Every structure is written in structure tokens, then in C-alpha cells.
Amino acid sequence: MYVIQINKATKTYNNGTIAVHPTSLNFEPGTFNAILGPSGAGKSTLLRMINGLEIPTTGEIIIQGQTLTAKNLRQVRSRTAMVFQQFNLVGRLNVMTNILTGRLYYIPWWSSILYMFGQRDWKIAQWALNRVSLKEKAWERVDRLSGGQQQRVGVARALAQRPEVILADEPVASLDPIASEEIMELLREICRQDGITIVANLHQVSLALRYADRVIGLNKGRVVFDDSPQALSNNKNTLRTIYQREDGSVDDTLEMAVTD
């Protein structure tokens, strides 16, 4: 069974903008999938549809055999964790409390308001903290951490959900090159060792080629490439197809990719 199935899904906004044209994609369990494309290609919208943050205009999203609907949104979201470019952490709270918010799907609403977590939640959060090698930072305020450390907290929060899928929306775009490599290594390790499917929007082509099992190229809301990193690296014309603008010029990302 595929862990994610996208069946002819589209997204059109009220102003008539088509963010995603009819798209069908399947994702295997335990694979690392990178999505490339210029700004405005529909990458973030696609991830948000998978997580239920955006509702497809037409088509359907299926997670672990269950079609995403308004009625089962909370249940399905609990199995698809998000990692964000800007971390989406509460800076004034400590690391452990931020990680515990990954357990909010599993506790009553009144407990979530009071940040009342059970023993199992604490054990899972501690495991997630150790998994990202931040044990010594457990009680430190998040806003005192480096960018790379904050993203590790973001990954730990995602792990605390015990998800089948982690959706990473530009997870290293705000980080320096060394921290970027460390986060990508961590995500690949989680994919390999924990069997969690990773779907990551990336700006850096070189990282997609180095870490992904599969690369999907989007341009103007359409899938224009879907193959292995090796197939992409062997064909620079395909890179131009992915990053070509409407006026025929190419996105700056392509120039960086060619010189990587």
C-alpha cells in the first residue's frame, strides 16, 4: 500500500489562480522524496494539501488508505507531521515544551490548553529529544538556540507525533550550509532507520540529488519530472524545464545548481 496517494488533485483559489493543475502521485513507505521547482511552482500548496491545511478543489488525497475529508482531518493530520522553514516554534518556551506540542493530537482539548501531558507523552518527547541529539538543551528557551538547533527541535516535535510521514517545507532554506547538511543528514537517517516517509520541498538542487531517493519537479503547478536523482543529474535540459519561467528565462536556482 502507498503511504500517500494523490489522485488528480487540483487547487484553484478564489481569485482564479491555479496553484496546482491535475496531479497524481504515489509515495512508497520509507522513501525520501524531494520536490524541486521555482518560487510559485505549487510546491508548498501541494504539501499543504497532503497535510489537510489546504483542501483540493478537485481530486483526492489518500493517507494510508484513508481519504482525507473534513471529518477525519484531525486523525489523518496526526499521521503527517510538518517541518517548517521558519521553525514555527514558541521562542519563549523551553525545548521540551515545544516538542511536547507534537502530542497535542493525542490529548483532550482542555489538557492542551493547560499544557497537561501524560507520562507516555513525556516519554515520547524525551525519545524525540534524544533522537535529534539535543538532550542537554531540554530546558533551554528555544529563542536562545542557533537556527540549526531550532530546526532540530522542529524535527523532534514532528517525531513526537509518531507519524508515518514527515512533510518538510523548505526545511533548510533559513540555515547556513553546515547546518543545512546536518538537518538533511538527520532527515535521511530518520527515513532509513525509522521507516518514515519524507516529502521535502527543497530550494537547493544539490541537496535533492545527494539525499533523495526520488526527485519530483514542479513548474507552474504541473509535474514536469518524476524520476531518480541520477536521471536528473544526467540531464541538464530537464533542470531547465523545471526552472523555466513563462518568459523563457530560468530561475536563479538553476544557475546555482549548474555551478554546485
Curated annotation (Swiss-Prot):
Binding site for ATP: G37, P38, S39, G40, A41, G42, K43, S44
Its membrane topology: Peripheral membrane protein
GO terms under cellular component: plasma membrane
SUPFAM superfamilies found in the cross-reference section: P-loop containing nucleoside triphosphate hydrolases
Keywords: ATP-binding, Cell inner membrane, Cell membrane, Membrane, Nucleotide-binding, Phosphonate transport, Translocase, Transport
Described function: Part of the ABC transporter complex PhnCDE involved in phosphonates import. Responsible for energy coupling to the transport system.
This protein's encoding gene: phnC2
Domain ABC transporter, first and last residues per copy: 4-245
Record has Cell membrane as a keyword: yes
GO molecular function: ABC-type phosphonate transporter activity; ATP binding; ATP hydrolysis activity
EC number: 7.3.2.2
SMART domains in the cross-refs: AAA
Main localization, broad class: membrane
Protein name from the UniProt record: Phosphonates import ATP-binding protein PhnC 2
InterPro entries: AAA+_ATPase, ABC_transporter-like_ATP-bd, ABC_transporter-like_CS, ABC_transpr_PhnC, MetN_ABC_transporter-like, P-loop_NTPase
Pfam families in UniProt: ABC_tran (PF00005)
Subcellular location: Cell inner membrane
Similarity comment: Belongs to the ABC transporter superfamily. Phosphonates importer (TC 3.A.1.9.1) family.
NCBIfam families assigned: ABC_phnC
Biological source species: Trichodesmium erythraeum (strain IMS101)
Summary of subunit composition and partner proteins: The complex is composed of two ATP-binding proteins (PhnC), two transmembrane proteins (PhnE) and a solute-binding protein (PhnD).
Reactions it catalyzes: phosphonate(out) + ATP + H2O = phosphonate(in) + ADP + phosphate + H(+)
